[in-house]
């Protein structure tokens, strides 16, 4: 058997397991991980045809005996696109070096020795190149085999899911074929409603029509969902199938690109290389050993240097290129296969989702649909089930009648036996009463015998069953159902025939037994009369005890003999009648057993036929499936054949094209050869002519030697002069080319310098600096205000009219003048501008100074903004808000009472302007009028009818507020910007600062006399429709007691709208918006 081989899908490496044994599957995985440097958890092992190797399938001896050839090893990281796997180079190839003799004209001993070392290294390299080509070709084929196995694995997995999907579809189709959802309503209306089970009820009374409708709706909904899910899954399966076909085509493309067939030229080149290397090595050794004595060997080595060494280098270079190319092909194929494996993983994830849906969601939905169908099928099965129910009741009734009849007979027989036993015990007790003194004799027996009767069942007769059958027939129930019910009825009647037969036979036997019993009783009576007639049979006393006992024994013996004889006669007659009856019963039982055996045989044959039919169906489906698979494989083979033919045609066309190219090259070489031959012929002709001329010249040489020498010298001088002129022309041409290139570079540099110069000028003007000239013509950069006014900061137009610098226009004119000028002075003038601006760091220092000024200005402005921000924040914290109050605002709180609202005076108007409330009544606490001494003004100064008496400086820092408290006017100085606010406390006329009464927060009904009620409200200057009232708490009003005004920061706002049923303690009009406010006061 061939050894098993491990093949890695990552790089195509392989390892043979010829003599290795792995007791467990884990040992195999650990060996694979150590061999191919893969983590044990990431190893996936596949067999041929895409079968996964699992722990349960591993048996080293069994697999070895079965002849397992290959195990394909996959690293699970290959299927994860998030993990980058670097392509590992198992070895590197180095380009062969040139021979040390190739560039030398003379050869010595050292050169030959060095060349021999070079030849050994070259032989090793060529051998390595050949080995790497063969090994890489095998690894490429192994990787392609792994790709095929992976696609087979995906195909098997998809086929498994497709089979599961087809089973679900088949199950659903069977449910549709036998579905009760489309039939139950017709059966319910035409059969269940028509068939009556009594005078008031029909079969339809067993169901609730609403529940049946709900079940039908559930069936339709569930069936619709299942169909939609199956359609979606079908789309996914079809997509995976198409994706799988795409992957197969991609693998075929990879094969067509990557497969490198063995080339016979490699072996021929290697053999030729070895042959030439051996010849060169032998000649070199011989030359080294005999270099001083043999010129022939030296000449041979030199010839080999010119012929063998170039060929050796060419062959080694060819093998090197081929090895490098096949390694590069392998690397590209690794990347392509990695993308293929990632696509396989994605396709498998899609099919796994399909499988999960089929095994979980679809399975539960199928069970639910089956349950609903079974519930509706009860409507279809109820007519037959109810008929079977009636037949079962009828059968039980027949059995109950037989049971009752037999029970009554046995009760009468047992009653006779009981009476006889009672009589016998009385007789014995009468004869042997004396022994009861010594022994306990139990004489107790029940007086009657009774068998507990069974509970009575519902009475059903054949008339009711036949009437039910007639109703089913009139309701057009199928004949199959009626035939089944009639057969069950016949079977029930046959089941109760055997007990009747046994009863008849038992009646005959019982009559015979009764006759024999009567005869025995008569004989016992005659015997008893005979005993009474003999005096010696009477019981004796103590004196004649032995005689009496003996006599009694004799009498008992006689009685036993008589009784035995009579019993034998009876038993013989009973035995005869019983044997006859038993024979009849045995005949009947034999017939019944024959019929039952025949029935069992028929049932077995029927079950066998059914099983054969089911097996044939299974085989049929298997044949269909196998035919489908064979058709698929056949189509794949046809596709492969077409692809193969196409590939062969392409190769044939390529070969023909190659032959045509070779033919064309051959023709061209032939033409060249012909041309060379012609040239050789012409050269020979010329040579002959030259020979003739030579002869003529030799003849005339003596005469014209002096003249020729002079002409030669003149020609030599002319040649020398011409050579000098040619050299000068070549130097001029090269210098002209270089000068043109330098001129182009110079123009580009000048353009760049011009752009930099103009950009620098624009940059200076954008920061307010102007480049100008002084009296001496030197550049200077000065600060000019308003220079940036006309510049656009977002657009730089260095050629526009926005630039103000005179130097910019000068250098622009200079640049325009030197574009086509070849004079170097304008160019030097142009460069001088750049040196003046950048040579002495004038530009850098000006920009740095300007930015330092801007930075100091920015720091100054930042400091001023910070101070302004702190001052603004302080002002914001100290300001008093007069409208649109929010949490944290500082507000002015003022007291007001209900009496002020009733006065039509300037004071009430003033209070209305100051406060945001309008009270008709109040539930607040009442305080007495407060008087401020030494601050009373004449009443005439207050015009009650003129509202203009309100002061106009309400918003000023020092504000005078007029508040009416009785007939006294109070002035309050409010400083909003001062840290210590001046509050005015009011007291009574006696100068006491204590108020006359305290704030009462319990109830206003406890006041002894009507007093002014007061609340605290926020001052609003613009919007008087919204009311802001301080919450009535003990802390607030205790804190503000004896205060005329207060400033507090709002901590809470509760919005209220006056509506019917809403809280309105101040009797505001409807739809009035008012806020209940909490505040924090600073009264220090």
UniProtKB/Swiss-Prot annotation:
Q: Which family does it belong to?
A: Belongs to the ATG11 family.
Bias category Low complexity: which stretches? 940-949, 973-993
Q: What happens when the gene is disrupted?
A: Impairs the cytoplasm to vacuole transport (Cvt) pathway. Mislocalizes ATG8 in the cytosol, when ATG17, ATG29 or ATG31 are also deleted.
| UniProt feature coiled coil, ranges | 585-739, 847-879
**Subunit record text:** Homodimer and potential homooligomers. Interacts with ATG1 kinase and the ATG19 and ATG34 cargo protein transporters. Interacts with ATG9, ATG17 and ATG20.
Annotated function: Involved in cytoplasm to vacuole transport (Cvt), pexophagy, mitophagy and nucleophagy. Recruits mitochondria for their selective degradation via autophagy (mitophagy) during starvation, through its interaction with ATG32. Works as scaffold proteins that recruit ATG proteins to the pre-autophagosome (PAS), the site of vesicle/autophagosome formation. Required for ATG9 anterograde transport from the mitochondria to the PAS. Also recruits the ATG19-prAPE1 complex to the PAS. Required for the Cvt vesicles completion.
Alphabetical GO CC annotations of the entry are: Atg1/ULK1 kinase complex; phagophore assembly site membrane; vacuolar membrane
Molecular function (GO) terms for this protein are: molecular adaptor activity; protein kinase binding
- Known Pfam families for this protein? ATG11, ATG17_like
Extra remark: Kluyveromyces marxianus proteins are shorter in length and have a more ordered secondary structure than their S.cerevisiae counterparts, which might contribute to the superior thermotolerance and solubility. K.marxianus could be therefore useful as a new model organism for further elucidation of the molecular details of autophagy.
Report the membrane topology from the UniProt record.
Peripheral membrane protein
**Gene Ontology annotations of biological process type:** autophagosome assembly; autophagy of mitochondrion; piecemeal microautophagy of the nucleus; protein transport; reticulophagy; ribophagy
Q: Which domain of life is it from?
A: Eukaryota
* Protein name, UniProt field: Autophagy-related protein 11
State where the protein is found.
Preautophagosomal structure membrane; Vacuole membrane
Name its species. Kluyveromyces marxianus (strain DMKU3-1042 / BCC 29191 / NBRC 104275)
Q: Where is the composition biased (Polar residues)?
A: 994-1007
Which controlled-vocabulary keywords does the entry list? Autophagy, Coiled coil, Membrane, Protein transport, Transport, Vacuole
Q: Where are the stretches annotated Disordered?
A: 925-961, 973-1007
